[in-house]
């Protein structure tokens, strides 16, 4: 989920690169077609022969940078999907937009910049980021980022709903990768925003799981305090499955995990899924939850992940297709 640079030692934690003083768009990540400057817009015909013209816009919602990809014509059936990148490739909104092309959906795609990273690096840059990661990985960095994203979600949805004249009361879609997946899951646990469908890729299922990975990587014992224990009690999908299953709108939830993800492994995600599935079955909604293992998928994906070749391209396409099909099935049905 992030590369921690402690002193001169590079420590890889969940496969991520967090470097202050560096452009939030990696030189290895190509800019998506029709990427434009803040508050400007431009048509994008590049999605393929079956896609309608789309517009890409860079906006700020409050202080939150949001990259928008929307249909040229927004109608009453157009849905909103909020997408969160990870701390590593795809590690910012632009990289995620390049990795996950969903242009044929009748949906406004809002790629949101997570707190603490990319264009939202804290004052003090790399030194400050390293300090908070080292001194308090949970409330200084990881949980601070995902809980901040969850707290911002309602206002983001409200403003985009008003700007594009949407009907978000029917429910939105959420996508999250890695830390962004944790942010999306925390929203399912805590946010009042109506969420109809969600896709989670390679996400830690609890604060504890991420701390254990931090300890393995740094070979250092994390020092728990009351604040970090409280954070751990707020984010544990397996133990809090009832909260998701009791939502007024039961979210159609697809959990995707790579079998080559050495940082997270498969079992925590599988256990969380089984706990959730039991509740979904109890509500007679078993078809609204699914667990998919992608063979060969390591932690990161997309341009800039370091993986190359036809096998990786096939994996990236599989993530894109699973995401598209899930949203089309449960969010955008009959919306064209």
Regions found by a protein language model. Give the residues of each.
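Primarily recognizes the serine-hydrolase "nucleophile elbow" in alpha/beta-hydrolase
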Residues: 155-216
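Acidic beta-to-alpha connecting loop that harbors the catalytic carboxylate
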Residues: 87, 259-261, 297-298
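The feature captures the conserved acid-bearing segment of alpha/beta-hydrolase catalytic domains
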Residues: 208-284
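Conserved alpha/beta-hydrolase "nucleophile elbow" surrounding the catalytic nucleophile
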Residues: 85, 175-178, 258
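C-terminal catalytic histidine-bearing segment of alpha/beta-hydrolase fold enzymes
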Residues: 279-336
């Amino acid at each position: 989920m992030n590369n921690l640079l402690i002193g001169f030692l590079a420590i890889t934690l969940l496969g991520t690169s967090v470097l202050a003083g560096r452009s939030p768009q990696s030189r290895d990540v190509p800019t998506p077609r029709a990427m434009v400057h803040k508050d400007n817009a431009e048509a994008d015909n590049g999605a393929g022969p079956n896609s309608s013209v789309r517009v890409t816009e860079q906006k700020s919602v409050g202080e939150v940078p949001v990259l928008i990809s929307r249909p040229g014509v927004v109608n009453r059936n157009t849905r909103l999907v909020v997408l969160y990148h990870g701390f590593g490739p795809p590690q910012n909104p632009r990289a995620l937009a390049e990795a996950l092309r969903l242009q044929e959906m009748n949906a406004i795609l809002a790629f949101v910049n997570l707190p603490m990273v990319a264009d939202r690096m804290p004052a003090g840059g790399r030194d400050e980021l390293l300090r908070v990661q080292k001194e308090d990985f949970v409330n200084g960095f990881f949980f601070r980022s995902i809980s901040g994203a969850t707290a911002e979600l309602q206002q983001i949805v409200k403003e985009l709903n008003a700007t594009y004249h949407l009907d978000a009361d029917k429910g939105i879609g959420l996508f999250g990768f890695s830390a962004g997946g944790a942010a999306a899951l925390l929203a399912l646990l805590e946010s009042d925003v109506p969420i109809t469908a969600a896709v989670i890729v390679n996400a830690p299922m609890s604060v504890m799981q991420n701390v254990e990975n931090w300890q393995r990587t740094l070979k250092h014992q994390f020092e728990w305090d009351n604040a970090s224990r409280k954070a751990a009690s707020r984010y544990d999908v397996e133990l809090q499955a009832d909260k998701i299953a009791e939502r007024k709108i039961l979210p159609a939830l697809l959990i995707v995990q790579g079998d080559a993800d050495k940082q997270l492994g498969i079992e925590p995600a599988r256990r969380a899924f089984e706990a959730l599935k039991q509740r979904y079955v109890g509500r007679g909604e078993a078809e609204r939850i699914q667990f998919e293992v992608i063979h060969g998928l390591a932690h990161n994906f997309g341009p800039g992940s370091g993986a190359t070749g036809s096998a990786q391209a096939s994996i990236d396409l599989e993530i894109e297709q699973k995401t598209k099909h899930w949203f089309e099935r449960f969010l955008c049905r009959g919306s064209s």
